Amino acid sequence: QKKSAWVSQVTLYGYLKTRMGAKYVLMFEDEIFLGSINKAKWNIYSVALQDLTFYAISFLKNIRNQHDTEKANEIYFQILDNELQKNEMPNEIYENAKKKFLERYQNINWNEYHESLPFNTSALSLYEWSPIAEELKSLDKKIVLNSMILKWDNVKKEFICLLYTSD
């Protein structure tokens, strides 16, 4: 949960800061823009959380022979419910995240997910939801996607290291 929030927020705010330059601080006084950032933040985070949940369960299933893939539902919905109740995740985003999670869950290949661009969906979500003009975003697509993927690579390394040091 914390890693998903960290990756999504660091990449979103980093992208905004890079794109806006000196105006970055001033934009936080604009209520409309703040609303856009909040909407983007929650949408990106909900997908990042899906990616990390699916990655962890797929990895454990294949590397540790743990076959309880239903745990993905329990983990994701427990965290999402907590975000709704304690952190004021917007209800519309909450409902949409649940729906998208279930769609992805039904179609996931647990044997391959952890090895087949497991964080691509959240990187695309960062690109889609960032409140940046489309003509500028199109110039940044590769950089934006790579920035998130590189952060996820660090999370994957930490996860694997934790698993093997706990043996």
Positions of predicted regions on the chain:
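N-terminal interaction modules that seed assembly of large macromolecular complexes
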Residues: 19-68
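Polybasic, proline/glycine-rich intrinsically disordered low-complexity segments
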Residues: 77-148
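Amphipathic alpha-helical scaffolding segments
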Residues: 67-81, 149-153
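Short, solvent-exposed secondary-structure capping/transition elements
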Residues: 57-72, 85-93
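Preference for long, well-ordered alpha-helical segments
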Residues: 141-162
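Alpha-solenoid helical-repeat scaffolds
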Residues: 2, 6, 39-46, 70, ...
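Conserved small/polar residues in nucleotide/adenosyl-binding loops
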Residues: 164-167
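Leu/Val/Ala/Ile-rich N-terminal alpha-helices, chiefly Sec-type signal peptides and the beginnings
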Residues: 1-24
